[in-house]
Design a protein with these regions (language model features):
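Basic, glycine/lysine-rich polyanion-binding surfaces/domains
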Residues: 2-245
């Protein structure tokens, strides 16, 4: 069973002809910061704020934050998740707290084992539909999938000072020995329940933080204020691409 949000349109309207551009819960903040906006995968996103080179330099030196809300967030819940992973081509079990990369012909993804009965599948915005279609046939028994993409805000915190910044906002143990690269956990950041995924970029410590949409601005603002002494800057899609390539 797949649970998704719905957009209601008039009867007879061809949905394929609708040009719907989505915005994250942080859109008004990006506008206030005079971000240069672009459309990517039907999302309006900040391409850059000051300029990409300055933003990249700041991340390399200290820390930066980026709105990654458009990434696909597919939550699979139920028993026998190990069997589900096997059916979609991942032959080992994904242990609680582990994050593992996986690929299908439909697209790349990471599998994040949040609990015994919860697996978060994270993929790129353009691969949400093909990945969903590929894994849906394997939702047997009591397994079901919920598309959280538009319901959750995503914030990437990246740079050598990212751990230090987050440690001022959470009691999650982020020490390297406890929470190494490719780990995930659910806990509280700025006193808000979040999912935290450690997924480093270009050898720089990086955390993906996902929170329900209604707390997105609160979390972004809290991080920005707490990181001001570190020279924290927001960065956009241009720099995000450099961190991936």
């Amino acid at each position: 069973m797949i649970l998704k949000g719905f957009v209601f349109v008039a009867e007879g309207v061809d949905m394929s002809q609708l040009d719907i551009v989505k915005r994250s819960s942080l859109h008004s903040i990006h506008v206030e910061l005079n971000a240069s906006m672009i459309e990517e995968s039907r999302w309006e996103r900040p391409n850059w704020y000051i300029n990409p080179d300055t933003e990249m330099a700041q991340i390399t030196a200290t820390v930066g934050i980026c709105d990654i809300s458009p990434v696909g967030k597919l939550l699979v819940e139920g028993d026998k998740l190990d069997g589900f992973c096997n059916k979609i081509g991942y032959k080992s079990s994904v242990k609680w707290g582990d994050v593992v990369p996986h690929s299908l012909s439909e697209g790349k993804m990471v599998l994040c084992r949040l609990s015994a009965n919860q697996l978060l599948v994270v993929t790129s915005a353009e691969n949400i539909d093909p990945v969903t279609n590929a894994i849906t046939p394997e939702l047997t028994g009591c397994l079901h999938l919920t598309d959280l993409t538009s319901l959750y805000t995503g914030i990437l915190v990246c740079g050598p000072q990212s751990r230090g910044l987050l440690e001022t906002l959470t009691n999650i143990d982020l020490r390297e020995s406890i929470f190494p690269n490719m780990s995930c956990v659910q806990g509280r950041v700025a006193d808000v329940h979040c999912t935290v995924i450690r997924n480093d970029r270009k050898s720089m410590t990086a955390y993906e933080i996902y929170v329900t949409r209604d707390f997105g601005q609160y979390l972004w603002t809290g991080m920005s204020e707490r990181g001001s002494d570190l020279g924290l800057l927001p960065f956009g899609v241009e720099v995000l691409g450099r961190l991936i390539s």
